[in-house]
Amino acid sequence: MIGEDYNWKVQGERALAIYDEMRRSDATVSAALDVVKYPVISTEWDIDPASDDQADIDVRDFVKECLFNIVDWSKFLDEALTYLDFGFVVFEMVFEPRVVDGATRIALTKLAYRKQTTIQRWLTEDEQPGVT
């Protein structure tokens, strides 16, 4: 997104600093964010299999193990919902071999949060700006 902001003074690092200050010090902004975030955080999450086939049930069980037992799901939700504060959020997915249900599998072991204030830009595969 380049040049689409209504207020051109609120861009880049300055925008992130303003958003961070607003969410931390403005009670109205903080309350509005909480109203949206709390229902998501307090929801009991589950995963349904794609079908009743045993293969789909096994996939569901593996995904549940990764997301709810290996990865800290509540921490992920807290961090993921910061997209509401800043307009975007980035995670690095980390995979490692793990024994799950007696079999060694490549499992999602971490969703590493990359704080918005540490990201200034990145390039896409065609070397065009992704976020500027």
For each predicted feature, which ranges?
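Structured, mid-chain assembly/scaffold modules that mediate subunit interfaces
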Residues: G3-T132
